[in-house]
């Protein structure tokens, strides 16, 4: 499945939450902690190829996700995403490690999810700052929604959380 998304930096989470409410977005998943583990082989070939293999733990479950490389053909992030629920991440992580993979990056964030009309918006609080991650049906729809929230194309953040947090940690 193709994922189409973009991030925007958020200065004030209360203001952006109010704007989303005024636009009719409702909270579908309340604020919760997510733990993310990005896996790679020992040579870093997944990162070099621009792909991601991630295990995510949330209070409602665990998922294994593959993300393909980000397309350069758009200002927004287009990439293949394949995801499945897993029962026991604590068993799966050592299985990957025994198969030649290692945890390349580990990070946590608090996330609140809002939805409406084919959009999924995540308000993410990370150690690198707060971001609004907008997934939607098309570039035009996402850009239009961004404008309603007070953002423009110059505010697009195409970097991944792993990149943003890595920069903050090395910084």
Task: Map each language-model feature to its residues.
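Short phosphate-engaging motifs
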Residues: 12-16, 130, 141
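Internal alpha/beta scaffold segment
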Residues: 145-149
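N-terminal strand-loop-strand beta-hairpin
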Residues: 1-119, 151-171
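Short, surface-exposed beta-strand-loop junctions and turns on beta-sheet-rich folds
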Residues: 70-73, 129, 140-141
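A contiguous pocket-lining binding segment that forms or flanks enzyme active sites
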Residues: 123-125
